[in-house]
């Protein structure tokens, strides 16, 4: 095509005409990030003949300063008139393709590199996507012309250009070095076939990652579910149980399938992209994305399950938007059935949502249909998204994982593990969450309302506020096969029946949920709101001198940079002063001036709201805050003492906050933090002991503020222990202890003026009690009453003395004693009645 100047002129004219309409871009700037050896010739491999694709690739190469595919190139003595070839040859006039032969250019390349030991050629696979969508059998007319798995003809491509040409994406992939293949010394024919196979596999995996696997239309999928053995058996059992005909039970199963299944539609995805592009840049100050390149590398050839944290209803839309913008297939998203409302439900369904009921109890047929639907998605390799927390976090903490979807995923993988499953944790951090005021009411004790996507529209009146930036961090992937190898090494040899439910499933699913939560927290995006919140909420009056605030924030930034929480954690740019100005610009930080300077403070409403943003990063501050707490009641401690008390308390903090380090790594991390404290003057190391600064020093004030970040958590631990010890063994069951803890915490919050409703969150006490049971510090007798190990007393009188001031411990013990007396009096009155 480029052998003569005339043909080059024709090609250039066609390209310019094409770009009167077409707009193209590379996926994730892939044309600019190629690791090319500029001294070696470059060739471009295209999957199939297309003059329009070649024109787009040539344009993107010119933009990126890459060698152009339409110009000649030399490999040793071989001179090729152009630097591209098609892996699949053009069809003849009857539409037939001979896929057995190799591209002539590739054949000559293999020969040239083989004959010249000093030569190499770099082959860059390039794909052009005219719109992105999974293949449907029937759908909106625009979707008919989007890239799919169907064979594309000239007329279809022309219409695709007209309809979708303004959203054209190009993926340049890592180069294949021909020298590496030739040096395997397999001979000309084998090397040629190996090159073709590598390219075919690459194009297939890339297409699956970008436009989704070859998935049939929704109606076909739903009807296909009814023929699966698991669902057929459930239909028979439903008919017998409900005393109805099998045909009636089959119709019921079909209705369940239609209720559940998504109706993925490209036109809706494209519409959402346009709307959301406006939204993220109008309401928010854009989106900051980190570590998505790891997802782009792992997506081809894997069943990807995205497991984001859940902070807002717009989480549903955010991840799909980002994936689409970065050249990855938007996932099928598990959504609560409450969102399946008129108009909104249809829009979400066409955007990839599939709907699930809050509980499957009492409906085995529904369970079978839902389970089989997910199994179909997993085995076809279609990306899926679900929230392991279940609902949105109202407190800003990572909620305890709900293991239902994880269990379904595990059982599906045990049935069919040919498609490797990888979980991708996604941390979504808002500087200001849209539903913040709604959460504020619930934090203050208002009854939790039923979730509805219309919660978003309730905040429209507040959109004049500044909402800051959204951060999305992709965490370390969890490969399910590797996880199971560590938990159950013989899992591959076990039964693979659809209803197989091994004895170890529950415990393994629980540990998988914990692993996901830990990886989510590892990917936390620390923002200015988080750091200002954790600083001011650690002061007694929720206020701090402007200069002192700047020093604290600078210290926190320095410490977090010195001892990174994880490679996937991100920190804000700038210094303490820039963080203060940023939060002030969002009207969440009040200021009062006097003759001595400026005081920054939180009003009552914002103080409660800021607990949400503090809790986002509490897991990052937990360990350094615990270490700082030791020096509030002790002026000096040896390393051995610090490690002993840290090991005593750490398991409870780790369990509640999903902290990443196992006990085996704890000593090393503690040493890193102690070294950072010494470096910043928060501690001194003298005579084999760590010594705190003078109580009147600035450094001691900083150390004290840091210690208070985790103070309320430690106080809750001590409350439960004090109530248990005062009650005596075999007196309370877990529910009674939980209720007493909640009442006691409410009392203490009034007595000490704590404006943090989560301080008496019943679920936190419930989890702490369960952790004590898991660690065998507590035991249940036959009547369900709690007895305790002697180490509980040691925990209260040893470790607690090190981390809680004497007045706090005394106050807790007094309230605990009073609570126990009231409980006993109530019991006596009940007995007398």
From Swiss-Prot:
Can you provide one Gene Ontology molecular function annotated for this UniProt record? glycerol-3-phosphate O-acyltransferase activity
One GO term describing the cellular component: plasma membrane
Which SUPFAM superfamilies does the record match to this protein? Answer: Glycerol-3-phosphate (1)-acyltransferase
Enzyme nomenclature, EC number: 2.3.1.15
Topology relative to the lipid bilayer, per the entry, is:
Peripheral membrane protein
Q: Where found? A: Cell inner membrane
* Catalytic reaction annotation: sn-glycerol 3-phosphate + an acyl-CoA = a 1-acyl-sn-glycero-3-phosphate + CoA
Cystine bridges: none
Q: What is this protein called?
A: Glycerol-3-phosphate acyltransferase
Q: Which organism is it from?
A: Pseudomonas syringae pv. tomato (strain ATCC BAA-871 / DC3000)
């Amino acid at each position: 095509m480029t052998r003569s100047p005339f043909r080059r002129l024709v090609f250039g004219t066609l390209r310019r005409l094409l770009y009167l309409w077409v707009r193209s871009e590379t996926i994730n700037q892939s044309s600019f990030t190629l690791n090319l050896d500029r001294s070696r010739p470059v060739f471009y491999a295209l999957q199939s003949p297309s003059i329009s694709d070649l024109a787009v690739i040539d344009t993107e190469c010119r933009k990126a300063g890459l060698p152009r595919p339409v110009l000649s190139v030399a490999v040793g003595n071989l001179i090729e008139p152009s630097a591209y070839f098609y892996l699949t040859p053009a069809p003849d006039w009857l539409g037939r393709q001979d896929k057995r032969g190799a591209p002539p250019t590739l054949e000559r390349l293999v020969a040239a590199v083989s004959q010249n030991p000093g030569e190499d050629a770099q082959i860059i696979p390039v794909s052009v996507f005219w719109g992105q969508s999974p293949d449907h059998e029937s759908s909106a007319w625009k979707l008919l012309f989007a890239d799919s798995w169907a064979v594309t003809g000239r007329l279809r491509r022309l219409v695709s250009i007209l309809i979708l040409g303004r959203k054209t994406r190009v993926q340049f992939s890592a180069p294949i070095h021909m020298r590496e293949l030739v040096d395997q010394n397999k001979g000309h024919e084998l090397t040629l076939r190996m090159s073709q196979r590598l390219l075919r596999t690459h194009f297939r995996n890339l297409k699956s990652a970008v436009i989704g696997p070859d998935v049939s239309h929704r109606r076909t999928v739903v009807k296909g579910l009814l023929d699966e053995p698991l669902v057929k058996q459930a239909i028979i059992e439903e008919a017998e149980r409900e005393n109805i005909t099998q045909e009636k039970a089959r119709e019921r199963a079909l209705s369940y399938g239609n209720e559940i299944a998504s109706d993925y539609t490209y036109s809706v995805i494209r519409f959402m992209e346009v709307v959301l592009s406006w939204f993220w840049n109008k309401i928010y100050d854009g989106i900051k994305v980190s570590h998505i390149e790891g997802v782009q590398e792992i997506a081809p050839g894997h069943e990807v399950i995205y497991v984001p944290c859940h902070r807002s209803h717009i989480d549903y839309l955010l991840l799909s938007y980002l994936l689409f913008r970065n050249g990855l297939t938007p996932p099928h998203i598990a959504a609560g059935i409450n969102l399946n409302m008129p108009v909104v439900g249809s829009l979400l369904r066409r955007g990839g949502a599939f709907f699930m009921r809050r509980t499957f109890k009492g409906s085995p047929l529904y369970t079978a249909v839902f389970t089989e639907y997910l199994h179909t998605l997993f085995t076809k390799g279609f990306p899926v998204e679900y929230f392991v927390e279940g609902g949105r976090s109202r407190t800003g903490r990572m909620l305890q994982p709900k293991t239902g979807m994880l269990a379904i995923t595990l059982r599906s993988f045990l049935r069919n593990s040919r498609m490797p499953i990888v979980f991708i944790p996604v941390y979504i951090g808002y500087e200001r969450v849209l539903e913040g005021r709604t959460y504020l009411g619930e934090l203050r004790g208002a009854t939790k309302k039923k979730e509805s996507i219309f919660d978003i529209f309730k905040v429209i009146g507040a959109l004049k506020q500044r909402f800051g930036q959204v951060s999305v961090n992709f965490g370390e992937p969890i490969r399910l096969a590797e996880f199971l190898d560590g938990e159950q090494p013989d899992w591959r040899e076990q039964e693979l029946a659809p209803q197989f439910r091994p004895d170890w499933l529950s415990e393994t699913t629980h540990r998988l949920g914990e692993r996901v939560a830990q990886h989510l927290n590892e990917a936390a995006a620390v923002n200015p709101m988080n750091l200002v919140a954790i600083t001011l909420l650690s002061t007694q009056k929720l206020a701090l001198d402007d200069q002192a605030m700047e020093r604290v924030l600078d210290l926190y930034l320095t410490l977090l940079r010195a001892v990174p929480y994880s490679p996937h954690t991100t920190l804000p740019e700038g210094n303490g002063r820039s963080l203060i100005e940023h939060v002030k610009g969002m009207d969440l930080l009040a200021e009062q001036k006097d003759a001595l300077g400026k005081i920054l403070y939180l009003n009552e409403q914002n103080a409660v709201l800021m607990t949400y943003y503090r809790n986002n990063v509490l897991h990052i501050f937990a360990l350094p805050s615990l270490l700082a707490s030791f020096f509030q009641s002790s002026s000096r401690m040896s390393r051995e003492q610090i490690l002993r008390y840290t090991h005593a308390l750490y398991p409870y903090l780790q369990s509640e906050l999903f902290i990443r380090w196992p006990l085996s790594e704890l000593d090393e991390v503690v040493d890193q933090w102690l070294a950072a404290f010494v470096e910043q003057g928060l501690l001194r190391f003298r005579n084999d002991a760590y010594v705190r600064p003078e109580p009147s020093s600035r450094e001691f004030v900083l150390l004290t503020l840091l210690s208070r970040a985790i103070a309320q958590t430690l106080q809750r631990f001590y409350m439960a222990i004090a109530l248990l010890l005062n009650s005596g063994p075999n007196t309370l069951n877990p529910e009674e202890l939980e209720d007493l803890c909640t009442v006691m915490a409410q009392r203490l919050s009034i007595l000490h003026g704590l404006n943090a409703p989560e301080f008496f969150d019943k679920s936190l006490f419930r989890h702490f009690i369960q952790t004590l049971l898991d660690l065998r510090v507590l035991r249940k007798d036959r009547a369900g009453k709690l007895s305790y190990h002697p180490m509980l007393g040691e925990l209260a009188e040893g470790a607690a003395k090190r981390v809680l001031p004497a007045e706090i411990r005394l106050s807790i013990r007094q309230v605990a004693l009073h609570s126990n007396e009231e409980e006993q009096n109530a019991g006596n009155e009940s007995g007398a009645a």
